[in-house]
Swiss-Prot record:
Its EC number is 2.3.1.74. Signal peptide: none annotated. Keywords: Acyltransferase, Flavonoid biosynthesis, Transferase. InterPro entries: Chalcone/stilbene_synt_C (IPR012328), Chalcone/stilbene_synt_N (IPR001099), Chalcone/stilbene_synthase_AS (IPR018088), Polyketide_synthase_type-III (IPR011141), Thiolase-like (IPR016039). This is Chalcone synthase 3. It is an enzyme of class 2 (transferase).
Length: 389
C-alpha cells in the first residue's frame, strides 16, 4: 500500500535547483545617455525649464549609464502627447502599449533561453512571469504561454508590481518549484518596459526625475531545474539558499503607485544609506552556515539601483573594485531594468568568465551572492554556487 509519505518523497528532486540557460532581450530603440537630456526636454515640451534641464543633465552625468534601450520612440511619444506630460491622465494609452509589448519582449528572451537549453519547449512544466509594467487579465504569463506555444497544462505564476527586488524573488520561487517537483523545468521571465513610468519633468518632484535618468527596458529569461540530465543539459549555477527581508525603518523609502497618470515612483535620498547599513546582516545570515565571512571571496551580482547604492555597499563592506564589475557593466550598458537587471548580470558574468578562460561561471570563484533591492525596502538574498565553465 502506497502511503502519502511515499508519494511526497517521490515528488521531490534529489539535488539543488540549477540554472540551465539564460536569455536576454531589449527593444531595438537605443538611447545615448549623453544626448538624452536634450531629447527628453524637447519631446516633453519642457525646454523652457532651463535650470531643471541642467539638474537633469547632472543626474544623467552621474548615473554611470552610457546607453539604455526604450520601447518608447519619438514617433510613439508624438502620437501619445499625454504620456509626455508630468501628471496627465494617460493610463489607458500606457496599458495599451505594455499589455502587448511586455509579453512580446519576454518571448524574445525566452526563445533565446530555450534555444541555449536545447530541449523541446514541451518539457517546460512551470512558468513564472514577473513585470512591474502594467496589469492585465489574463496576465502576461497567459499571453507568453500562447506566444511561445507552451503546453496548456504548464503551471503558471504571474507576479505584478513587485519592483526592483523581484529578480531575486523569481529565483527563490523557481528554486522551491524545481526542488519540490521532480523533473520540473521552470521558465522564469522578467520583462520590463518604461512606457508605464515615463513622464515629463516637474520642478517639485525631483525624485521622479531621478527615475527618468536611470530606468531602461529589457527582458531576461532563465530555465531552472534540479538534477540536470548529464551530457544533455549544461548547468551554470546552483541556487543554494534564498531569503527575503524588510529593512528596519525603511517605510516609504521607495514607493510606486499605479494611478490614472501611470505608475509614479517616489524615492527618498536615504535609500543608499539604508541598504548599505543593512546589507551585511543579510550576508552574515546567508553565509554563516557555509563558514564564509570574507565578502571579497564571493562573486557578486547586485541590483544596480543606481551608482550611489553600489558605491555605498562597496564602501561599507570593503569590497575590491572588481567585485561589482559585472553589475556596473550592466548598469552602464542598459540602465536600471528593474527585475530583469540581476538576470542580465548573471548572464554577463557567466559569459565573461568563459571568455577569460576562468575555471568557474562565477569569475573563477566557488561561492557568490545575488542581491535584489526594491520597494519596502525589501531585500532578496540568493546564495549561488558556480560550476565549471
Amino acid at each position: 500500500m502506497v502511503t502519502v509519505e511515499d508519494v511526497w518523497r517521490a515528488q521531490r528532486a534529489r539535488g539543488p535547483a540549477t540554472v540551465l540557460a539564460i536569455g536576454t532581450a531589449t527593444p531595438p530603440n537605443c538611447v545615448d545617455q549623453s544626448t538624452y537630456p536634450d531629447y527628453y526636454f524637447r519631446i516633453t515640451n519642457s525646454e523652457h525649464k532651463v535650470e531643471l534641464k541642467e539638474k537633469f543633465k547632472r543626474m544623467c552625468d552621474k548615473s554611470m549609464i552610457k546607453k539604455r534601450y526604450m520601447y518608447l520612440t519619438e514617433e510613439i511619444l508624438k502620437e501619445n502627447p499625454l504620456v509626455c506630460e508630468y501628471m496627465a491622465p494617460s493610463l489607458d494609452a500606457r496599458q495599451d502599449m505594455v499589455v502587448v509589448e511586455v509579453p512580446k519582449l519576454g518571448k524574445e528572451a525566452a526563445t533565446k533561453a530555450i534555444k541555449e537549453w536545447g530541449q523541446p519547449k514541451s518539457k517546460i512544466t512551470h512558468l513564472v512571469f514577473c513585470t512591474t509594467s502594467g496589469v492585465d487579465m489574463p496576465g502576461a504569463d497567459y499571453q507568453l504561454t500562447k506566444l511561445l506555444g507552451l503546453r496548456p497544462s504548464v503551471k503558471r505564476l504571474m507576479m505584478y508590481q513587485q519592483g526592483c527586488f523581484a529578480g531575486g524573488t523569481v529565483l527563490r520561487l523557481a528554486k522551491d518549484l524545481a526542488e519540490n517537483n521532480k523533473g520540473a523545468r521552470v521558465l522564469v521571465v522578467c520583462s520590463e518596459i518604461t512606457a508605464v513610468t515615463f513622464r515629463g519633468p516637474s520642478d517639485t518632484h525631483l525624485d521622479s526625475l531621478v527615475g527618468q535618468s536611470l530606468f531602461g527596458d529589457g527582458a531576461a529569461a532563465i530555465i531552472i531545474g534540479s538534477d540536470p540530465i548529464p551530457e544533455v543539459e549544461k548547468p551554470l549555477f546552483e541556487l543554494v539558499s534564498a531569503a527575503q527581508t524588510i529593512l528596519p525603518s525603511s517605510d516609504g523609502a521607495i514607493d510606486g503607485h499605479l494611478r490614472e497618470v501611470g505608475l509614479t515612483f517616489h524615492l527618498l535620498k536615504d535609500v543608499p544609506r539604508l541598504i548599505s547599513m543593512n546589507v551585511e546582516k543579510s550576508l552574515v545570515e546567508a553565509f554563516q552556515p557555509l563558514g564564509i565571512s570574507d565578502w571579497n571571496s564571493l562573486f557578486w551580482i547586485a541590483h544596480p539601483g543606481g551608482p550611489a547604492i553600489l558605491d555605498q555597499v562597496e564602501l561599507k563592506l570593503g569590497l575590491k573594485e572588481e567585485k561589482l564589475r559585472a553589475t556596473r557593466h550592466v548598469l552602464s550598458e542598459y540602465g536600471n531594468m528593474s527585475s530583469a537587471c540581476v538576470l542580465f548580470i548573471l548572464d554577463e558574468m557567466r559569459k565573461k568568465s568563459a571568455e577569460e578562460g576562468l575555471k568557474t561561471t562565477g569569475e573563477g570563484l566557488e561561492w557568490g551572492v545575488l542581491f535584489g533591492f526594491g520597494p519596502g525596502l525589501t531585500v532578496e538574498t540568493v546564495v549561488l554556487h558556480s560550476l565549471c565553465t
